[in-house]
Amino acid sequence: MPRIREAAQLGLVAAVLLVGSGPERVVPGATAAEVDATIQPVQTQHAITVNGKELSYTATAGAVRLRLEKSDAEASVFYVSYRKDGEDAARRPITFVFNGGPGSSAAWLHVGALGPRRLLLSDEGTIPEPPARLVDNPETWLRFTDLVFIDPVGTGFSRAIAKGEKGGDEEGKAFWGIKSDLRSLGEFIRLYLNHNGRWASPKYLAGESYGGFRAAALAELLPAKGGIELNGVVLISPVIEYTLNMGSDYLNLMPWVTFVPSYAATAFHHGKYRGAATDLKSVTEEAEAFSQSQLLLALASGGSRKSQQVAEVLAHLAAITGLDVAEVQRHRGRIPAEIFAKRLLEDRGRVVGIYDGSVSTPDPNPFSAGYPARDPSLDPLVPSVVSSFNGYVRDELEYRTDLRYDLMNPDVIQAWNWAEADLGELPGVGPRLRIGLSLNPKLKVLLAHGYFDLATPYFASKYVVARLELDEEVFPNLRLTVYPGGHMFYTRTDARQQFYRDAKALYEMSSMTPQR
């Protein structure tokens, strides 16, 4: 199924998982003895000060041992949970959080945005001089919900359990596929609710990138398969329909359309925009209208339209994206993200990030026509997240293990079973999201994106939302917001603060009690 295999080449997946991989990246399965040594949860008491008030909480770091249904595959799934002290668990919301990849641990959202302790960054999201350190997080979601951060199998400290005395990576493959991954996450959530007496709590999901894909699917699957009712879902920089993010097939024109507004936003940020709009909102709105009308028609027409008409469309595309007209004509209006990121600031000797187009650095390989192997908006963050989380989990949470914490594991994506997608097409969860919303009219959904995200562009989600054909009673329950920033827009202070307010509003609308 070649189209399914192409999904593994999607920029957001390949770039994340290959960053800093090093020569030896095999994550072996853990033996039963190793699992037994780490599965016992460790509880610690903490407090942070937010707006002059103390927020005290209990942190638990541990693992849940689970088995896939109708399978002998077992795994130890690592988690860190936070429970605000002095609250009634039956009325207190609980949120299950995971990142994406597939192959990424939850540390990104954990110490990047939602947890009570956050990686110290500048207001623009840049990293200060090492060593990395954590600070109290005034935008922690613990202010309005308890939190459970989950590392899917093969990431973080989560491991498949090896059958023999020696660990191997074969056991992990039973969990590395679209459906098996969803089943294992659903089983973890069920077991966690059992073990911690949280069935009566308002329940939420929050997932980033492929984690948004997971959360959208689970919005339909958890109630249907597990009897787990949900109050809300937050999709952070999600990929909902892969067919809108992949432009490898010239018969599929939509990816060439959905990326254009983010290209225009990035060009505007760097002073390369040559259109008529004068602010970011107007720039993107004009780009949205143009890309799904004139540009789409020009791409669809092939050679049937007069060349002058097509030339005018391509000239306008060049103007709003900041690229040379010749470059746009060379690609016939079909601009891959890597080409855009390489060419936009080429005259300055710089490249922009795919994960955040507002970030630029000197081109590390100016003599190559291709995009650098390292993303300037992602790579610098990786060592800081890894080192800060390793210190945090051991020193503050007192969780002791000799297992390596895998922030990103390329073995997962390389072995991922994309063929589990329905009908052999590219994966998509738009219909599942529609079903989840329609069958649960009280479910609230927030889609959050960054304007400068060139991996999962916001306009792809906006395009999906407009075509879900939700009932007028249900449609107000779904909200899409776009923030200044990239894929991890929450690294910027202004975006993180607004995201916190938007998420808090969703919880107040959907849970049974107002949150303080």
Across the structure, where does each feature detected by a protein language model lie?
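Catalytic histidine-centered segment of alpha/beta-hydrolase-like enzymes
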Residues: P484-A495
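Alpha/beta-hydrolase fold nucleophile elbow
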Residues: R198-Y210
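A catalytic-pocket lid/entrance helix-loop region that shapes and gates access to the active site
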Residues: P116-L120, P223-I320
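Alpha/beta-hydrolase fold catalytic core
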Residues: S301-A455
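Catalytic-loop region of hydrolases
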Residues: V26-I94, A106-W108, G112
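Short alpha-helix in the alpha/beta-hydrolase fold that links the catalytic acid
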Residues: L443, P457-R467
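N-terminal cap/lid subdomain of alpha/beta-hydrolase-fold enzymes
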Residues: S71-W176, A466
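Conserved acidic catalytic loop of the alpha/beta-hydrolase fold
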Residues: R183-S201
